[in-house]
Amino acid sequence: LNDKNFWDEALKILNIKYHVNNIENIPLYGPTIFVANHPFGILDGLILSSIVSNIRDDYKILINNELSKIDHIKEYLFPIKFGNKKEDVIFNISSKNKSINHLKNGGCLITFPSGEVATSKFIFDQPNERKWKPLIGSIIKKSEPKIIPVKFFGQNSKLFQFVGFFNNNLRRALFIRELLNKKNETFEVQIEKSIENLNIKDLSNHEISDNLKSIVDKIN
């Protein structure tokens, strides 16, 4: 796949299409962070990267380290590890600082602040995301970018939810299956206007992330 069009080409191979509402809300330049919900997994990243890469070429993606092994896209990624080892913390501080510097230099950053795909708490419940990571609040506080909320509509299969209820590692193993079972479908994405009324300086990192999750959850 051609590096520049990796996201578009990957979606084309899968015959996955998307419809974007209010794409004009994406700033054409300047520090910008996209905060998106995470209902599907790999597909969310493919679609949002496709959207943003067709408007701006100064984008990076804050991404789970498990998904950062593809040579074609490594240059666009700031990987994050979700372990508790000392080396994981050091690794994440590096990616966090790179993200902050990228935004301060006028770039844009794609994020999925939950760090985990939405899943059901109980077998027959609707899938929900975990609390968003305070890391996003910290990045925003130190770089002061425009904040663009993004909402994907839909959810993964009942099998994915069922397996996730019992075994989180097995649920992760189903990510590729979930991507492939969405072939030939069209997905809707809502891009909201930049958030202007969030008093970043008066909020903790946790409060910033909680507020942003609430804003995205309410998009319909």
Describe these PLM feature segments.
Residues S53, D58-N92, K96-S99, L103:
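Conserved nucleotide-cofactor-binding alpha/beta core module
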Residues I93-N220:
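Non-catalytic C-terminal accessory region of glycerolipid acyltransferases
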